[in-house]
Amino acid sequence: MREYASDRVDLRSDTVTQPTESMREVMASAEVGDDVMGDDPTVNQLQDKVSKMLGKEAGLYVSSGTMGNAVAILAHTRPGDEIVAYTKSHIFRYEGGGYASLAGCSM
């Protein structure tokens, strides 16, 4: 693993973050609910805030860029469509044709 200066925050992945003790305390005391059932107040507040900021009727929180890509592709394509992506894009290089398989599209 590459070494970085100690004054940098590494946000490449949630697997390399190091929460502080105060962050852990906030997480432990946070009000939570089942997001699948629409009962998580934090997710609901975030979706409402962002949809209002963007002037949209509603928002949908997705937990990763990968999930966002999947939602977008499934919303905008039908089986048999072609997905056009830059050859150096993450979706083309690292997703291994998963989206093409998921959506029934060619890449």
Regions from the PLM with identified roles:
Residues R2-Y4, G59, R78, V84, ...:
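Structured catalytic cores of enzymes that bind and process phosphorylated ligands/cofactors
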Residues T15-V16:
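Short coil/turn segments
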Residues R8-V9, E31-G33, D81:
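A short, structure-level motif marking secondary-structure boundaries and short turns
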Residues R2, R8-L11:
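Pyridoxal 5′-phosphate
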Residues A75-R93:
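Conserved PLP-anchoring active-site segment centered on the Schiff-base-forming lysine
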Residues L102-M107:
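PLP-dependent aminotransferase-class I/II
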Residues P19-G65, T87-R93, G98-A100:
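Conserved N-terminal alpha-helix of the aminotransferase class I/II PLP-enzyme fold
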Residues V50, G68-H76:
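Buried hydrophobic packing segments
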